[in-house]
């Protein structure tokens, strides 16, 4: 845990008592603050009260004595409208911040030179965060990983000289971190997302840009420049004096890092040097993972990791569960769990990575469906449709892709396995990449992916892939 000493002797309101909120309560208390905790969910309030914290309906308290409101990132700050707790804080002149802001203040007070890598982007954040942490750990560093990837930042060990904090940040968390100052900031990409919370793509992109604009003066901004929003951000912060490393997987760069036929190449001053070859690394398959690997490599290089050891460390990366996770193999068939593919944009990356696909898709449908994937339909040998979206997806696939409505994973997995094994194809892939949310049949995408893995490994003759 990171004791938060910057509010010692003061009273702090904490609203939103999930994982990060509860961790904030503990960290503030450990640092000497008095904590008043609030939440719109009665069960969360009861849990925090059982942990020994004072709870209150923050609508009915005076805000004049609060030094700050620590807000969970899931609570609306601006759109569609500010949460009532935000309005109450602003009316009382109380600053509204998040748990990563508390971390930044502690780092500034106690270990300002401790390496801090912050990662954001519409897609690829978690994989890149895990990969940076893996590369730094394999290079012999003391590494703490957390943030949006799952472990609340204040639950990690405190910043200190030589300890590297690798932190995934959502746009909501960036909004709540005015003192953000990473040693290395990574912006992977920007595409329309979370506009219900940001209003416009312009505002969403501006929030993402804040992370790289906040890089310390001696630090490095790593920016994927294959979309207009990120490319413009890179130009703007470079003009402001920041050191920028541009990354592209779509075209060679005269100054920056590009990926050419699985080779990560750095160019500068007319010279080129190969950093690594990621061909054949299952956990980094696909162009999207090539971008993740290139950005992670750029961050590791900026922190002093030698180019000579990056190759072996990239190859040993195990990947993340539910993201192009290879879970089993039987004869000619590979089984891939991409349950995190919850929309067409994410599933496009999975379909682009294989040529002979037996595709399990469906769930709670997202706006736009799977029509944007039409160019990839020739890769699909057969589709197995599940959940609420099954009929809608069947209508899109009619006359273009052979399909069956399986209804459930329990029916889809053995059917896809049977057809793939009997196809005679040398590289058949049974791919779960639903292009849908999971909430019609599962608690979350993790539960859906876990069930897929269980069903695959229960099939006769399947060998788990470590």
Curated annotation (Swiss-Prot):
It is found in: Cytoplasm. ATP binds at residues 121-127. Its EC number is 6.3.2.9. Its main location: cytoplasm. Pfam families: Mur_ligase_C (PF02875), Mur_ligase_M (PF08245). GO terms for molecular function: ATP binding; tetrahydrofolylpolyglutamate synthase activity; UDP-N-acetylmuramoylalanine-D-glutamate ligase activity. GO terms for biological process: cell division; cell wall organization; peptidoglycan biosynthetic process; regulation of cell shape. It comes from the Bacteria. It catalyses: UDP-N-acetyl-alpha-D-muramoyl-L-alanine + D-glutamate + ATP = UDP-N-acetyl-alpha-D-muramoyl-L-alanyl-D-glutamate + ADP + phosphate + H(+). GO terms for cellular component: cytoplasm. InterPro entries: Folylpolyglutamate_synth_CS (IPR018109), Mur-like_cat_sf (IPR036565), Mur_ligase_C (IPR004101), Mur_ligase_C_dom_sf (IPR036615), Mur_ligase_cen (IPR013221), MurD (IPR005762). Keywords: ATP-binding, Cell cycle, Cell division, Cell shape, Cell wall biogenesis/degradation, Cytoplasm, Ligase, Nucleotide-binding, Peptidoglycan synthesis. Cell wall formation. Catalyzes the addition of glutamate to the nucleotide precursor UDP-N-acetylmuramoyl-L-alanine (UMA). This is UDP-N-acetylmuramoylalanine--D-glutamate ligase. The lineage of its organism: Bacteria, Pseudomonadati, Pseudomonadota, Alphaproteobacteria, Hyphomicrobiales.
């Amino acid at each position: 845990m990171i004791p938060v000493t910057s509010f010692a002797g003061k009273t702090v309101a904490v609203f939103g008592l999930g994982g990060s909120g509860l961790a904030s309560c503990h960290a503030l208390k450990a640092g000497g603050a008095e904590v008043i905790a609030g939440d719109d969910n009665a069960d969360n309030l009861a849990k925090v009260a059982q942990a020994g914290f004072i709870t209150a309906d923050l609508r009915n308290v005076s805000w004049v004595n609060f030094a700050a409101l620590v807000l969970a990132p899931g609570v609306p700050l601006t759109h569609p409208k500010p949460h009532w707790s935000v309005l109450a804080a602003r009316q009382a002149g109380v600053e509204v911040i998040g748990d990563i802001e508390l971390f930044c203040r502690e780092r500034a007070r106690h270990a300002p030179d401790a390496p801090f890598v912050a990662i954001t982007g519409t897609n690829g954040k978690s994989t890149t965060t895990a990969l940076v942490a893996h590369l730094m750990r394999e290079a012999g560093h003391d590494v703490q990983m957390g943030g949006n990837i799952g472990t609340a930042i204040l639950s990690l060990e405190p910043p200190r000289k030589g300890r590297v904090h690798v932190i995934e940040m959502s746009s909501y968390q960036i909004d709540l971190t005015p003192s953000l100052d990473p040693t290395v900031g990574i912006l992977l990409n920007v595409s329309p997302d979370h506009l219900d919370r940001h209003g416009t793509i312009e505002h969403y992109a501006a929030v993402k840009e804040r992370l790289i604009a906040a890089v310390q003066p001696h630090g490095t901004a790593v920016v994927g420049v294959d979309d207009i929003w990120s490319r413009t951000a890179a130009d703007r912060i470079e003009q402001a004096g920041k050191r920028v490393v541009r990354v592209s997987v779509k075209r060679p760069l005269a100054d920056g890092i590009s990926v050419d036929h699985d080779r990560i190449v750095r160019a500068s001053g007319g010279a080129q040097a190969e950093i690594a070859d990621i061909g054949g690394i299952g956990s980094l398959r696909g162009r999207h993972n090539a971008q993740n690997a290139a950005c992670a490599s750029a961050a590791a290089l900026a922190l002093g990791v030698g180019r000579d050891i990056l190759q072996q460390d990239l190859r040993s990366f195990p990947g993340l569960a539910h993201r192009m996770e290879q879970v089993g193999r039987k004869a000619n068939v590979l089984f891939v769990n991409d349950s995190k593919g919850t929309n067409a944009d994410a599933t496009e990356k999975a379909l682009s990575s294989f040529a002979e696909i037996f595709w399990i898709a469906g769930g709670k449908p997202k706006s736009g469906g799977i029509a944007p994937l039409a160019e990839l339909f020739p890769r699909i040998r057969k589709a197995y449709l599940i959940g609420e979206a099954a009929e809608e997806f069947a209508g899109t696939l009619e006359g273009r892709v052979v399909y069956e409505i399986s209804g459930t994973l329990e029916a889809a997995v053995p059917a896809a396995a049977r057809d793939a094994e009997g196809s005679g194809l040398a590289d058949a892939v049974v791919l779960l990449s639903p292009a849908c949310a999971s909430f019609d049949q599962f608690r979350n995408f993790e539960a859906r992916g876990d069930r897929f893995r269980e069903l695959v490994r229960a099939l006769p003759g399947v060998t788990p892939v470590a």
